[in-house]
């Protein structure tokens, strides 16, 4: 009987201490609680053609691929038509200032053009007024993914 009392008392004290620790916010350290551990993922992976050649642009492309999109890259907007002839794309990403060349290249395609405007040049406002969806060149990967997801979802 003597042996059971200290064991029970120890169990009660341990449960009280553990309960207090969780109440103080330590629950954030439990896996899956409070902190996101997984990488961004594309719920609707799409086929994307992107005009990109700088290191920053190619880094964004890598992140879109890591999220699950199938991305093809061309260095110049004049190469879009050739790529569209070989593959079917859902979305074309290119700078807003290249919109006339992109429009000429995508005329016979079902691919949706999402312009990427340069920040602080006035392009952002113009692109937002002219297109249903647009991006800024320094938007986060999360913003790119959300915009692409909304475009793919709208297409059905």
Predicted feature descriptions by range:
Residues 1-9:
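Bacterial N-terminal signal peptides that target proteins for export
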Residues 18-20:
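N-terminal signal peptide c-region/cleavage motif recognized by signal peptidases
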Residues 22-31:
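Cleaved targeting-peptide boundary
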Residues 43-77:
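Short, charged N-terminal beta->alpha structural module
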Residues 50-55, 75, 93-98, 116-120, ...:
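Structural motif
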Residues 100-123:
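A short, gly/pro- and small-residue-rich
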Residues 116-152:
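Output/docking surface of receiver
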């Amino acid at each position: 009987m003597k042996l059971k009392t200290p064991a029970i008392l120890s169990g009660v004290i341990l449960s009280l201490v553990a309960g207090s620790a969780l109440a103080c916010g330590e629950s954030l350290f439990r896996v899956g609680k409070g902190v996101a551990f997984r990488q961004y993922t594309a719920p609707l992976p799409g086929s994307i053609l992107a005009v990109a050649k700088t290191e920053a642009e190619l880094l964004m492309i890598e992140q879109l691929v890591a999220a699950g999109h199938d991305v093809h890259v061309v260095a110049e907007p004049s190469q879009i038509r050739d790529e569209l002839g070989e593959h079917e794309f859902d979305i074309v990403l290119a700078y807003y200032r290249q919109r006339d060349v992109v429009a000429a290249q995508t005329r016979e395609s079902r691919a949706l053009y999402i312009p990427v405007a340069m920040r602080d040049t006035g392009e952002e406002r113009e692109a937002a007024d002219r297109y249903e969806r647009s991006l800024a060149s320094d938007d986060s990967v999360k913003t790119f993914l959300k915009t692409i997801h909304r475009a793919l979802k709208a297409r059905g």
